[in-house]
Amino acid sequence: MENQEHFGRLTDRMATFREEVLEEKPYIDAERAVLATQAYKENQNQPRVMVRALMLQKILENMSIYIEDKSLIAGNQATKNKNAPIFPEYTMEFVMNELDLFEKRDGDVFYITEETKQQLRDIAPFWENNNLRARGEALLPDEVSVFMETGVFGMEGKLNAGDAHLAVNYERILAEGLKGYEERTKKLKAALDFTKPESIDKNVFYKAVLIVIDAVHTFANRYSKLAQDMALTETDAKRKEELLEISRICAKVPYEPASSFREAVQAVWFIQLILQIESNGHSLSYGRFDQYMYPYYKKDMENGSLSEESALELLTCLWIKTLTVNKVRSQAHTLSSAGSPMYQNVTIGGQTTDKKDAVNELSFTVLKSVAQTRLTQPNLTVRYHANLNKKFFDECIEVMKLGFGMPALNNDEIIIPSFINWGVKEEDAYNYSAIGCVETAVPGKWGYRCTGMSYINFPRVLLCAMNNGVDLTSKKRFTKGYGYFTEMETYEDLLAAWDKTVREMTRYSVIVENAIDKASERDVPDVLCSALTDDCIGRGKTIKEGGAVYDFISGLQVGIANMADSLAAIKKLVYEEKKITKQQLWDAILDNFQSPENKKIQEMLIEEAPKYGNDNDYVDNLVVEAYDSYLDEIKKYPNTRYQRGPIGGIRYGGTSSISANVGQGMGTIATPDGRNAFEPLAEGCSPAHNADKNGPTAIFKTVSKLPTEKITGGVLLNQKMTPQMLSTEENKQKLEMLIRTFFNRLHGYHVQYNIVSKETLIDAQKHPEKHKDLIVRVAGYSAFFNVLSKKTQDDIIGRTEQTL
């Protein structure tokens, strides 16, 4: 691996383990689905929260378990590493529709045996019209049916998925063990006054919590016995000793508190794993790993029971295990989540709650371990602040140079004040972590999905506003309509139509999300996830009922740069310079710039109009003005947990479009910026491909003009450089200074880098067998280049290569 020597290499066993996991083909796995079906059938008379608890118990007590020969940690999600379990309680629709198509996909391919197909066919009738998707769709009001039919909001990720974008309270889990949670639950249950109506529901919830804690304990004990049995027949003395130690640890954690670093790692892994067996979610993150794990690391290093080498090997094992967790999405959902990402984020760095630099020895070790494994999971985020340890920052740049898109950098200087402005307590704001792509939250205290998952496609909404409320792709009416572009006399007329249209579309997106959230609350209340999030046990309710301390949702906006460039082209070339008439532009858009005359118009739009990403106030201010309409509207709408316990319960903006720029682009005709129909939109808040001509500083200045303090859901900025650009110490220091300027002076939110050449990507597309290990940053996550669809690969290849 290029530049790998700086961080050292994996031990031989971990290198072998890594290779074994990477070589595994991802198969569809029916075991969980069969066990879940049995549990639901056996407990149809029970309240749904009890059904969910008994389902998890059934799965954890009966699923296949194994311990890999090279692993130091126990715990698996499916019958084989990288297999994707099916979660029928969410949906079976896409599974059955795509049963014979999983292996034929352009990207995100999964394999499936005939036996598995038959197992899924056998259980499918039970789940027909009896799952989250069916109930969510049944709750949708008629006025939003057109949006579901056309898929304009991209709701696949919400209809088919479980808990997402959170980190449980790992610090408390390690300190108290699940035993502490059990004792607290029993005490509160015993104190219930059943003359109070709410106590009836609390009692059921507490019973469910006790069931899942016992189930987790049983699951860990199964591994303890397995390791002991394996030790009996193991002939290698060292491995025998390791298996006996695994057995001892699994008998203890996570039920009992952890007392060593190795116990803490195993406890964290068990919880991280089981949360992704309980629920078909994603972005279930590790939180501030270097902070809550440091006391165990420090103690063991000081007493001599842990060395730097053994800690590294244990962490690299954990990250390899993290990669084994998998999820199959519908073909439609892969358009916005390409590369089978799980978004399991590990956050390091940042500040302590008393505002000091939080970097410690473990921060460096985590960085080194991620560099050694060089995988797509976990998703590593470093919290930057003005006084970040210089040596640590240097090492972050060295990891970037390895070219696998990590770490991403989030900026304390804007994120912490933004949280405080929304009502988050200062000590909690200073303890935030990344929980997915660029989204951020307070670990162990945040509601069950901080991301809305209904995309507001800005360019498509603009076209709708220009066409009196009728969508040009589907020919369906989306909004009331506020005029035709060809009849709008001034730019202000267009802006007024945009304002009303985007507000109306935002309202509809909220209706869709609320209906699905209501269905999710009633149908798939996840007990373990709730129990491990403060203060669900204290309130006696699930996370989806408002059990968390905080609960905010960020909407997702797609095509920000296309919107900016479109507005600039219209204002400058049509209304100000009058080089193009309104009718000419409209006809060219409808023609997809195909005729010779319309190709000339396209050329003018691309070459003569100001472009977002070049520090040009003309275009940058236009998009801020348009964006404010959305931000002003979205904050009006509470979520379904509002005034039910959590602080917040409201919505704010976010640009974490993941790979939805590709999928949303496929549903969007040509746009006034000169983009052709059905081509990808710009991703995140990044400029459109090759529109940024003035270098990285200009991009940073443009992005910093966005109302970042209101976009607390994340301002995702992707940048791309060739490895040669960072081949000298001088350029490395230039990049550091550039990032410091962006964060310290311009108050940028986030930045991440693809350090890979266009030539390498093109060669990988032509000769995938030569580049099996090539990892790229897609959006707020990394993926193996070869598993992406060609359209997504092309989108990444087309990004501008920056120079320093």
Kindly label every feature range from the protein language model:
Residues E2-Y206, E242-E245, I249-L804:
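Conserved catalytic cores of very large enzyme subunits
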Residues K207-F219:
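Extended non-globular scaffold/tether segments
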Residues A227-Q228, Y297:
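Generic hydrophobic alpha-helical segments
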Residues M230-K240:
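A conserved hydrophobic secondary-structure block that centers on an alpha-helix together
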